[in-house]
């Protein structure tokens, strides 16, 4: 059941499961302006037998309030607000972020290093330069998405949408890129049910926000880190995860064969098993 909590002036939608006294895992979803907590909560709730799993929609996303500002820094501070509310002011948590959520997870683990015991990153990148790799990958896979284009990726997905409807339509036509086994009917239903907020997307891709770069700060991360990526990840190609794992002290890289950006869904049992093993070390 979805519940709501006020954090830093915003009403944030969340789900939580698992024993109240267990270590808290906060999952961070991807998708600037279009993501929500539901997929991650479903994917990672099997860990709820031993951990408390908290998944939430960022401000301006999903069922959470459209409370500005929509910035990386504000969302990172909201994450810490959720940590303090559900774990306690002095408690460490496990941060699990994928894609855009992985960007936020890195920023959180740098800014609030003492608040993170373990960091799990999925299909993400250490800087905005992943966009160059995504464009090259799309050039090779355009046959999978005949209604999508390089221009749409550059100018819309990595730029700005004119409306929520345009956002929804572009996301539908690009959906086959995300998984190695695409279900068109499920993709249509997902796009119909999903909330698209062009304003929050555009703010988070604005000139002030889009040029994030953690490459020089990854060494400041002290959490025990696992980096998971599918070998076919199109939008955050594996070289990004390899770089992160190399720069964070004692980080472990888990490269999953025949999996794409949605590796945690495509290879759910394998990924959950690996996360459990990492947390039990």
UniProtKB/Swiss-Prot annotation:
EC number, as in UniProt: 3.4.11.5
InterPro entries membership: AB_hydrolase_1, AB_hydrolase_fold, AB_hydrolase_sf, Peptidase_S33
Catalytic activity: Release of N-terminal proline from a peptide
GO cellular component term of the entry, any: membrane
Family named by the database record: Belongs to the peptidase S33 family.
Name the UniProt record assigns to this protein: Proline iminopeptidase PfmaB
Organism: Pestalotiopsis fici (strain W106-1 / CGMCC3.15140)
One Gene Ontology molecular-function label: aminopeptidase activity
């Amino acid at each position: 059941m979805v519940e709501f909590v006020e954090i830093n002036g915003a009403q944030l939608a969340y789900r939580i499961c698992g024993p109240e006294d267990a270590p808290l895992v906060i999952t961070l979803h991807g998708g600037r302006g279009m993501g929500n907590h539901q997929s991650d909560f479903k994917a990672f709730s099997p860990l709820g037998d031993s951990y408390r799993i908290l998944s939430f929609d960022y401000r301006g996303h999903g069922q959470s309030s459209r409370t500005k500002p929509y910035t990386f820094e504000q969302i990172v501070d909201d994450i810490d607000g959720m940590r303090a509310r559900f774990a306690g002011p002095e408690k460490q948590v496990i941060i699990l972020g994928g894609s855009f959520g992985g960007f936020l997870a890195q920023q959180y683990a740098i800014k609030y290093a003492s608040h993170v015991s373990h960091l799990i990153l999925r299909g993400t990148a250490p800087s905005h330069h992943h966009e160059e790799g995504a464009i090259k990958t799309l050039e090779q896979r355009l046959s999978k998405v005949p209604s999508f284009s390089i221009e749409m990726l550059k100018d819309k997905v990595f730029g700005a949408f004119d409306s929520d409807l345009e956002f929804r339509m572009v996301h539908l036509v690009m959906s086959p890129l995300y998984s190695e086994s695409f279900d068109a009917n499920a993709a249509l239903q997902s796009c119909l049910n999903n909330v698209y907020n062009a304003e929050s997307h555009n703010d988070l891709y604005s000139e002030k926000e889009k040029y994030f770069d953690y490459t020089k700060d990854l060494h400041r991360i002290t959490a025990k880190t696992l980096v998971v990526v599918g070998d076919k990840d199109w939008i955050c190609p594996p070289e990004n995860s390899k770089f992160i794992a190399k720069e964070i002290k004692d980080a472990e890289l888990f490269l999953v064969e025949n999996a794409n950006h949605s590796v945690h869904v495509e290879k759910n049992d394998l990924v959950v098993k690996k996360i459990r093993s990492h947390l039990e070390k």
